[in-house]
Amino acid sequence: MAGHSKWANIKHKKQKTDAQKGKIFTKIGREIAIVVKQGGPDPEVNSKLKDVIAKAKAANMPNETIMRSIKKAAGEVDSTNYEEVVYEGYGPGGVAVIVEATTDNRNRTAGEVRHLFDKFGGNLGTTGCVSFMFDKKGVILIEKSDKVNEDDLMMKALDLGAEDFTAEDEYFEIITAPEDFSKVREGLEKEGYEFVEAEVEMVPQTTTTLTDPKHIEFMNKLIDSLEDLDDVQNVYHNWYGE
């Protein structure tokens, strides 16, 4: 997977996560609400819920908070109906951007997302305008440490069905097809590996760079501002750099 901007993205995300854990937990709680309504509250039956629980644990979300979110979603009391929406557009300098959101009010969310694209030199496009530039992939990140043997991890990941294995500066990155993600993640979990990140994401096929300082400034602000919106779950792009 050489050339995609995953590593740049994770550095960006890690800074945000450390500073805004409460907001991250709220967003994961919404994801739990959606997958529980789709497939029920039992993670042994609902593989999507099992995947979101793994994501929650990777974000250091407390078990009590996870269980409370599941129970709340399974009952009708105090439960908000959320739906998933995806926005596509271009950032400054023609960077392709995909925004995934969960919302109880499509009009509000669309207005907020459009405002930020306009504010920072981009434009919101129509469905499909940039998604063809991305592939849906399972992405698992495991922190490098003395306890993790690179060759062992690579062989286990590939034996479980991973498509690719890369050693980055601080992390091992494992890429899977979306349909193999749960199997690979669960297999590594059973082997005792802990994840910095484990989820299905939109990975750019190729990346682009920005040279204009104003474009770089505005692109950073666009990503930050979109991620700060309560309704936004994920922001994907094909910009290499940050």
Curated annotation (Swiss-Prot):
BP-aspect Gene Ontology terms: regulation of DNA-templated transcription
MF term (GO), any: DNA binding
InterPro entries found in the cross-reference section: Integrase-like_N, TACO1_YebC-like_2nd/3rd_dom, TACO1_YebC_N, Transcrip_reg_TACO1-like, Transcrip_reg_TACO1-like_dom3, YebC-like
Organism listed in the record: Acetivibrio thermocellus (strain ATCC 27405 / DSM 1237 / JCM 9322 / NBRC 103400 / NCIMB 10682 / NRRL B-4536 / VPI 7372) (Clostridium thermocellum)
Location in or out of the cell: Cytoplasm
Residue ranges of coiled coil: none
Record Pfam families: TACO1_YebC_N, Transcrip_reg
Similarity comment: Belongs to the TACO1 family.
Keywords for the protein's UniProt record, in alphabetical order: Cytoplasm, DNA-binding, Transcription, Transcription regulation
Gene3D superfamilies xrefs: 1.10.10.200, 3.30.70.980
Presence of the UniProt keyword Amino-acid biosynthesis in the record: no
Source taxonomy: Bacteria, Bacillati, Bacillota, Clostridia, Eubacteriales
Keyword Transcription regulation tagged: yes
Protein name: Probable transcriptional regulatory protein Cthe_2075
Domain of life: Bacteria
Any single GO CC term annotated in Swiss-Prot or TrEMBL for this entry: cytosol
